[in-house]
Amino acid sequence: ILAAGRTGAEGPGAAASDPASTGAGDPYTPPEAITTTPELLEFVAHAAAYAREHGREKAAVAFTDPNGTFVAGNTHVFAVEYGGTVVVDAAEPGIRGTDISNQTDPFGIRFAERFEETARFGRGYVSYMYPNPANNGTFEHRIAVVEDVDGTYYVAAGLFASQGEVYPSVALNTSAGQPALEDLVAYVKSAVAYARTNGKEKALAVFNDRTGPFVQGELVMMAFDYNGTNLAAPPYSPELVKNRINLINYYDPDGVYTIRGMRDFATEGGGFFYTVVKVRANDTVVYVPKIDYAEPVDGDWWIFSGIVVPEYARIGPGNLTGIPVRDHTREEVYDLVNRAVAFAQASGKEAALAEINDPAGRFVNGDLFVWAESTDGTVLADPFWKEAIGRNCMNDTDRNGMPITKVGIEAMQNAAGFSRALFPNTAANETAEVPKLIYMKAVDETWWIGGGIYGLEVE
């Protein structure tokens, strides 16, 4: 999923059948265990088709039949009305009729809202965290396929990270030359020019041609409408475009909503955006930083492509020498920022800024710390970057031209608050820009608090 900028996904991942042409009467036997998103997509497509043909009540009975075709190992179908009332959930039958619209995952995501938004576009993938009953109720990353049934409710099924590839791993192309940033920009601009000259239909046909001129090693094209529905996909993810998968609520392993973020950039004329790709380097899993570049074609659709940040391409063959590794977790930065926001709301702005400015204060844990900015991008407090206090950073970019503050604010306002940048570790008085996962949260309508963790996640 979202592997633009790589050479191919590893492991199983054949294209699923098209839900638009899947009838309830078509023969279908689910696999013993679902381990890939294409399998999950087909599973949900048949559930939606069955519900359309047989009606809600009969479908609810069928979905809970442990010996039926809508239970595959630990994967089952659930159905929810628009508005958040559960129609049926085979794994949790007691919640039928319950309103789940305000339920959140550990990072504050109202996942039912994300389900509903995606389902209204037809079908798509939604990322969230949920307790896995097969793993003692431990919260795990989960990806759900959701599909509208009749405009009043949707069906869905989810895949936990312990069951399969929620974030598919890829193989980096180590034999071909590594594209530079200017190659990426030129590639996307050439695709935009081609689309504007030749029209949408012809351009999408060429972009989706796995032997066509826009498949150039690591450089491959992805296209979306402004709802986040896929129009063109890499050769190794044909199910995305075949099934018109909506990805507006798909996020990367750190909760960064990649398509939503790039869509927002595209509406403003385009720009750079960071995500990560899961790479298996020898016996190690590394989440390697990737830089994407997006541009609008017109008012109907936009495109992007991406490359591994060049200095990290050597991770592919297993060279981890000198790679900055995280000392903290996403959970830690989320907790620290939320504690700082709560302190500010309880103690007032003056006390909070004084505490944030203290390098030995309660909101500093090594190179995990918080800072504060006003909504116009002016730095109000920082325990280490003292020369920035009072300066407006709204238009500041990293060395690749990615606007750090703007991206963070858009993530805070439109997604879940997580974004990425390349930034020096100021707690260690370093000047080299390294990958940083940032989390930001508003205190009130006038200012916000942010924190971040440096380095790459290595498993």
Task: List where the protein language model places each region.
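C-terminal region of N-terminal signal peptides and the immediate post-cleavage residues
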Residues: 6-10
